[in-house]
């Protein structure tokens, strides 16, 4: 992850250096409505509440019974995000934004038994949510060719990446809040806006094993799900907005 942060800081630094010239597009922020698009990366995770109830099942060709499993998200993998921007100017410093985005990512949940008999094992969850956030953007005064801002709001998401063959199945619908910050850099033909956001889901994203009618054997593989009581989604996105 450090490598990605270094690349990001270099890109932002170059953008800032380019912006320290004559004022570009001095009246662009006076437009009532404008549009754009975004490209970037994401890091998806869960907060996991364990059930701490004994589970049984089949693992690596053998069976086990009455084991208490601990689960956590073991790694963060970078994903890809692309989106559309619609911006409505409400006041000099305040804008209303609708920014639907499609995200491609992956989460890995790692399990370990309390007794230590089973060792570590994991399952991957491929995610492809489309988010529909409605955000308020508050901007500071413009300085030369840059203008920092903060942003916040909420919305709804729907995950199209469900794979019923996976050991853990995420519910497709979720509601979330989102906060972040960024900076507008003004160039001759467009604004480039690096933006960092954090998203927190409200719903329990876990599909209980008794609600799954196909895909896995509840008796043999249900322990992946039964070891968990609650999943709440988290996502960090870094996007470069072109407006």
Name each region found by the language model:
Residues 1-24, 240-243:
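Bacterial Sec-dependent N-terminal signal peptides
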Residues 157, 178-186, 191:
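Conserved C-terminal beta-signal and adjacent last beta-strands/turns
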Residues 19-78, 235, 241-243:
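Short glycine/proline- and aromatic-enriched beta-strand/turn motifs that initiate or cap beta-hairpins
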Residues 146-147, 164, 168, 190-193:
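Short conserved catalytic/interaction loops centered on acidic-Pro-aromatic/His motifs
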Residues 31-33, 76-80, 126-130, 146, ...:
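Residues that define the transmembrane beta-barrel architecture of outer-membrane proteins
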Residues 24, 172, 185-243:
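Predominantly the C-terminal beta-signal and adjacent terminal strand-loop region
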Residues 26-33, 41-43, 85-162, 237-239, ...:
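Gram-negative (and chloroplast) outer-membrane scaffold detector with strong preference
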Residues 49-73, 105-125, 160-170, 206-228:
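Flexible, solvent-exposed loop segments that connect beta-strands
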């Amino acid at each position: 992850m450090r490598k990605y942060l270094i690349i990001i800081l270099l890109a932002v630094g170059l953008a800032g250096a380019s912006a320290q010239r004559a004022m570009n597009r001095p009246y662009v922020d006076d437009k009532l409505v404008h549009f754009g698009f975004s490209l970037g990366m994401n890091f998806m995770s869960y907060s996991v509440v364990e059930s701490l109830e004994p589970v049984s099942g089949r693992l690596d060709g053998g069976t086990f019974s009455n084991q208490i499993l601990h689960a956590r998200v073991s790694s963060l993998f970078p994903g890809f995000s692309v989106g559309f921007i619609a911006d409505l100017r409400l006041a000099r410093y305040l804008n209303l934004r609708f920014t639907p985005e499609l995200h491609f990512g992956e989460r890995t949940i790692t399990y370990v038994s309390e007794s230590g008999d089973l060792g570590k094992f994991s399952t991957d969850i491929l995610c492809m949510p489309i988010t529909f956030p409605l955000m308020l953007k508050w901007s500071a005064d413009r300085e030369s060719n840059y203008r920092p801002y903060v942003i916040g709001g909420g919305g709804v998401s729907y995950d199209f990446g469900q794979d019923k063959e996976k050991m853990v199945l995420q519910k497709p619908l979720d509601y979330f809040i989102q906060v972040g910050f960024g900076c507008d850099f003004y160039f001759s033909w467009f604004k480039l806006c690096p933006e960092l956001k954090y998203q927190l889901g409200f719903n329990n994203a876990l599909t209980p094993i008794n609600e799954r009618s196909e895909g896995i054997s509840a008796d043999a593989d249900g322990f992946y799900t039964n070891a968990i009581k609650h999943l709440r989604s988290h996502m960090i996105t870094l996007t470069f907005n072109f407006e």
